[in-house]
From Swiss-Prot:
Part of the 50S ribosomal subunit. Forms a cluster with proteins L14 and L19. It comes from the Bacteria. The keyword Chloroplast does not apply. InterPro entries: Ribosomal_uL3, Ribosomal_uL3_bac/org-type, Ribosomal_uL3_CS, Transl_B-barrel_sf. Keywords: Ribonucleoprotein, Ribosomal protein, RNA-binding, rRNA-binding. One of its GO terms (biological process) is translation. Belongs to the universal ribosomal protein uL3 family. It comes from Desulforudis audaxviator (strain MP104C). This is Large ribosomal subunit protein uL3. The lineage of its organism: Bacteria, Bacillati, Bacillota, Clostridia, Thermoanaerobacterales. Signal peptide: none annotated. GO terms for cellular component: cytosolic large ribosomal subunit.
């Protein structure tokens, strides 16, 4: 199983453009990466695997329930709005209470970004799955409806059949995006290309599975 080298939680701020040394304008996504606090470590000896639990965006203690208050209290850190666990190669490289910032990554590094895609609501087969539409002529019995769902023999629709339904609002990973700029003072990462989600949504930036081989 592949284990990532490093990762951080962040917030998508929006898109902009960045000019390379050759004067080429490239689209970039600005991500507020951290600061993230290490709330818990998990090791193979105690939990069976290596991972770190990161907290992102502080929030008042009155907005945290009692179990989480105790969890943050045992770690000796302030409560966080978001709490996510990331699998790592070796949890011994981290300490509880350690703060991770944008300078965790370097310019030119290849990363994967995980986020929740924009919700589009209920959508038909053409928009949701890219189906071809039917004839638009006057005599046609269908235009944008899906065709046959199955053969007559099974007398049922198999699971996984592509049909109209809710589009978006799911976990999406975009792989092999290049970091073109790091601003450690403002905890900003400029990542080349688009990142899933709306402005202000939570994203996870982590070492690429394939790009750094």
């Amino acid at each position: 199983m592949w284990l990532m080298a490093k990762g951080i939680l962040g917030r998508k701020l929006g898109m902009s453009r960045f000019f390379t040394a050759e004067g080429v304008a490239v689209p970039v996504t600005l991500i507020e990466a951290g600061p993230c606090t290490v709330v818990q470590k998990k090791t193979p000896d105690t939990d069976g695997y290596s991972a770190v639990q990161l907290g992102f965006m502080e929030q008042p203690a009155k907005r945290v329930n009692r179990p989480l208050k105790g969890h943050f209290g045992r770690a000796g850190v302030k409560p966080s709005r978001f709490l996510r666990e990331l699998r790592v190669a070796d949890a011994a490289d981290y300490e509880v209470g350690q703060v991770l910032k944008a300078d965790l990554f370097d310019v030119g590094e290849i990363v994967d970004v995980v986020g929740t895609s924009k919700g589009k609501g209920f959508a038909g087969g053409i928009k949701r799955h890219g189906f071809h539409r039917g004839p638009m002529g006057h005599g046609s019995k269908y235009h944008r409806r899906p065709g046959a769902l199955a053969a007559k023999g099974p007398a049922r629709v198999f699971k996984g059949r592509k049909l109209p339904g809710r589009l978006g609002g799911v976990r999406v990973t975009v792989q092999n995006l290049e970091i073109v700029k790091v601003d450690p003072e403002r905890n900003l990462l400029a990542v080349r290309g688009a990142v899933p989600g709306i402005r202000g949504s939570l994203v996870v930036v982590k070492s690429a599975v394939k790009g750094n081989e």
